[in-house]
């Protein structure tokens, strides 16, 4: 949700650029679009497991009800909050997340608003052991803080589908994730993982006691290819 991406999203929805006078009006239009989606009779927990919210969306109302409460209480859809501030520049074949100086206050607010979990994304571009280790360590380090705040983090170390050594990167990643999961104690996490080259690579993670659920990340594959994988 930014001044750059929102006009494009509104344009695809049918609201022409220039239909608003300032950024506040633009975000009001965006929330009206999101509200219409959430209030649709087709949008229920039968087909939609969870919805990821921006902070601004969490702070607003849908049909007079705070967004997260509306999702869970009216629609049986689990609300998650995007907490990361974007990606740092690529170093050693990977992009860790930028610092999140206001994370603790944000988590406290989210907990008070009925949010179940969080979403934060890093990207792995090549099979660099040290780069992948940094990504996974940061994800779990922040994930533990999120657990301590009473929420369930979605750990998302995306592997770029165009990485030339994708299979090798995924093998390294799988090992690093296992090590972190084994060290978690009594905290539980979710995982969001790029569809892998090796079938059932992440089967042990799906079965792991500390993992609530594993979400498939299509990462740019076509729907047909993603479903095949």
Language-model features and meaning:
Residues 97-104, 112, 129-137, 167, ...:
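Short, amphipathic alpha-helical segments
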Residues 152:
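Acidic/histidine-enriched active-site and ligand-binding environments that engage anionic O-linkages
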Residues 1-116, 124-126, 176, 180, ...:
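Alpha/beta catalytic barrel-like cores
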